[in-house]
Amino acid sequence: MPPLLTQPEVLERRLKEIPPEPGCYLMRDGEDRILYVGKSKSLRSRVRSYFRSRHDLSPRIRLMTRQVCEIEFIVTDSEAEALALESNLIKNHQPHFNVLLKDDKKYPYLCITWSEAYPRIFITRRRRFRSPLDRFYGPYVDVGLLRRTLFLVKRVFPLRQRPRPLHPDRTCLNYSIGRCPGVCQEKITSEDYHRTLRKVAMVFQGRSDELQRLLDEQMNRYAERLDFESAARVRDQLQGLDQLTADQKMSLPDSSVSRDVLALACDDRLAAVQLFQMRAGKLVGRLGYTADASALAPGLILQRVIEEHYSQVDAVEVPPELLVQHALPQQQLLEDWLTEQRERKVQIHCPKQRQKADLIELVQRNAEFELLRAKQGQEQQALATEDLAQLLEMPTPPRRIEGYDISHIQGSDAVASQVVFIDGLPAKQHYRKYKIRSSSIQSGHSDDFMAMAEIMRRRFRRWARAKADGVDVGALRHKGGSALQTDGLNDWPDVVMIDGGKGQLSAVMEALRELDLHEDLNVCSLAKQREEVFLPGESQPLESEPDQLGVALLRRLRDEAHRFAVSFHRQQRGERMKRSRLSDIPGVGPKRVKDLLAHFHSIDAIQMASVDLLSKAPGVGTALARDIHGFFHPAEEAGQDECSEEPRAHTA
C-alpha cells in the first residue's frame, strides 16, 4: 500500500472521513504496523495538521508522515477519556514514533501479591498483573538500594522466604531463627500475615514516620499488658526501621507533605528530565529520563514525561501534588486524569512561592548535570563510531552495528545472540535470540563455525530474497540512516561483528557468499585474547590498539553479545533441567506433572508410590497409574506381564 502523501485525492478523502470529535488516532505504515498514536479534542483538525503545513513539523514527525499509509480513529466521550485511551494504546503497541523517552532501561518495581492468602514480595521489572489486587510499588532508580532495603525488611519483619515449601511436613531453618512465620505449615493465619505485610508496604510507600508511630503505640500496649516478649519484638522492629530510613537525608520542614517535583534542562536536540519523589517530607526516590527535545516546548516535554511515567505506576504511587518547572499545555486535563487514577484530588502547580520554587531549582540543577553527562556520552560515542569507520575504511560512521555470539556446553542447549548498537549505544528493542537448529550440533558435539553460519543464513535470508527481487541492498550502506528505515527492510546493519577469530569469520563469509551478500556487508571479527580485529580475506589482524575508541566500541558490543548469549543459554538449560522425568511418560502432560508434584511433593515420592496410591492423585486413573508405576519399575512390570500370560499347550 503506497503512502498517503503520494495519493493526494485518497488523503483528502480519508481526512474528510475523520469526525471533529474527541478521541485517538492511529497511523499505520504499509505493513500495517502502528507508527504513531495520538489524542485530540478534535480528531479531524489534529490529523489534518500533520499534512497541511509540513514545515512546522519536527524532522521526526516529517519522517513519520512520509510512511503513513492508513489512518484509524477511535471516538471517545471526552478528551480526558482520550488521554487514558492513548496511554493504554502506547503502552500496548509501543509505536516507534511515540517513544519520546530515549531511555530503554526498565526501572525495577517491588511487587506484593495481595491476591494470595500468604502474599509474596519480590523485585521485578515487568508489571504484569495476575490479579487486580496485586500491587507494584515504584519504580526505583537504584536496584541495588532496593535489594538492600528488601533484605533489611526481611530481617526486621518475619515474611515468607520461599515461593514453595522446602519440606512437605515441617518448617525450615528460617522459621527456627525467626525470619519466617511458618507460612508453609500455616503457623500464622492469613489475616495476621496480611497485617504484617501492610506494615512492610508502608515502608515502600514512604510512610516510615507513620509506621514508626504505629509501632511505638503497639510496643507501649504490649508493655502495659506486661507482654514483654512481644514488646521486645516490636522494639527490634523499630530499631530496624531506623536503619531502613537512615539513607533518607533530604527532608522538608513539613513532614506531612507528599509530592513529585519535575524539572528539565535542554538544548535544541536533547532534554534531561528529573523527577524527585517526596513522601512524608522525605526524598524517597529520584528518576531520570532523557528525551528528544527537537521542536518541542519544555512544557510539552514535561507533559509527555508525566503521561508516560504515571501510566506505568499504581494509584498508590500518584501523589496529591505535582510541582512542575513550566506550565503544561493541558494541565487541567492531566489533573483530571491523575485524579481519576488516584481516586483522590491531584493538583499540578508551576510554583512561584519561594520554598516550592527552591525545590524546582534544586531539581533543575540536577537535570543540568544529567544533560551535561548525556551530551558528553553522545560526543564520546560519536568519536568512537568515527574511529571505527576509519579502522574499517568506511565512508561514513556506522549507525547500526550488530554483534553475534554462540553459547553452549559441549553442544547442549546451543543458542546464539544478536545484539544491536545504534549510534554507539545498546538498542535492546532490536536484540534477538536464536536456538541453534542444526542436527550436527547436539549434546557431546559442538561446532561454533557451523552454528555461526546457520545464524547468518537465518538472519539475512530475507535480504537475500530482496536482492534476488532487484533491491539494491548494498546501497543502504551509504545512506547513513539505515537504523531508522521503516520500509519493511528496516534492519540492515552498517557493520556486523562476530565474536571469534579467523575461523568464525571464514564460516560467516561462506554463509553470506551462499546468500550473495558477501560483498554488501561490512563484516569483522574480534578475537578474545589480544582484542585483535580481523577482516575477511586478511590473514593478519588490523593494526589497532586495545584502548582505541573504535576497538573499545567493538569490545563493548562483543561483551554485550556474550552476556546476552550466556543468559539465554542458562535460561534454556534451566528450563530443560526443570522439566521432570514425568514428562517422558505417555499421557502425562504439563498440567498433570504439576498436579502430581503438588500431590506427592517430590519425584522420589511418586517413584515409591504404589499403583493404588497413584490412582488416588487428582486426574490419575488406574490405567495411567499403572503406566506411571511401570515407567519407574519396568522390571517389575515385565515380571507381572510374564506371570499373567496363559500357559501354552504342548503336544507330543
UniProtKB/Swiss-Prot annotation:
Sequence ranges assigned to domain UVR in this UniProt record: 209-244
Domain GIY-YIG per the UniProt entry, residue ranges: 20-99
Subcellular location: Cytoplasm
Gene Ontology biological process: nucleotide-excision repair; SOS response
Gene Ontology MF annotations: DNA binding; excinuclease ABC activity
Classification via InterPro entries: GIY-YIG_endonuc, GIY-YIG_endonuc_sf, GIY-YIG_UvrC_Cho, Hlx-hairpin-Hlx_DNA-bd_motif, RuvA_2-like, UVR_dom, UVR_dom_sf, UvrABC_protein_C
Pfam families from the UniProt entry: GIY-YIG, HHH_5, UVR, UvrC_RNaseH, UvrC_RNaseH_dom
Protein origin, superkingdom: Bacteria
Family stated for the protein in its record: Belongs to the UvrC family.
Subunit structure, as described in the record: Interacts with UvrB in an incision complex.
Purpose: The UvrABC repair system catalyzes the recognition and processing of DNA lesions. UvrC both incises the 5' and 3' sides of the lesion. The N-terminal half is responsible for the 3' incision and the C-terminal half is responsible for the 5' incision.
Protein name as annotated: UvrABC system protein C
Organism this protein belongs to: Parasynechococcus marenigrum (strain WH8102)
